[in-house]
Amino acid sequence: MDKTMKFISWNVNGLRACMQKGFLDFFNEVDADFFCVQETKLQEGQIALDLPGYHQFWNYAEKKGYSGTAIFTKHEPLSVSYGIGIPEHDHEGRVITLEY
């Protein structure tokens, strides 16, 4: 049994702009087990991605057009947490933790 897993991490500097430049083509081509995105710069509901076979986890910044992260994974986690427990930092949407 093959236990190889592929992890991708990408600072997209704005996911909406990145979508215009082939993000979905690249996403589908690399077929990653875990695809982590930083600097999404989105608010909840601004974008809907149809990624069959992937669980999606988003952490949005409170400040519009600022920071934000997302993880797309083929593997369902046991638990998910957002932030690091420090309110002055957690409002930026920079951390998502998946437990397996």
Where are the model-predicted features located?
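N-terminal, active-site-proximal structural segment of metallo-dependent hydrolase catalytic domains
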Residues: M1-L51, A61, Y66, Y82
